[in-house]
């Protein structure tokens, strides 16, 4: 999982979902699990 400043590019990838957990924003992608990231 990458820690990134901006999740804007990742949320456009097909299959991406934005999830808020414990005050942090995560992008999870079941179609392409390499595209996981968190912000904050």
Swiss-Prot record:
Going by the entry's taxonomy, the superkingdom of the source organism is recorded as Bacteria
* Xref: InterPro entries: Ribosomal_bL36, Ribosomal_bL36_sp, Ribosomal_L36_bact
Keywords annotated in UniProt: Ribonucleoprotein, Ribosomal protein
**GO CC terms:** ribonucleoprotein complex; ribosome
**Entry's Gene Ontology BP terms:** translation
Molecular function, one GO term: structural constituent of ribosome
Entry similarity comment:
Belongs to the bacterial ribosomal protein bL36 family.
Q: What is this protein called?
A: Large ribosomal subunit protein bL36B
Lineage, broadest ranks: Bacteria, Bacillati, Actinomycetota, Actinomycetes, Micrococcales
């Amino acid at each position: 999982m990458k820690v990134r400043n901006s999740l804007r590019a990742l949320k456009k990838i097909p299959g991406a979902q934005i999830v808020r957990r414990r005050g942090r924003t995560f992008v999870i992608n079941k179609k392409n699990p390499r595209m996981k990231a968190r912000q904050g």
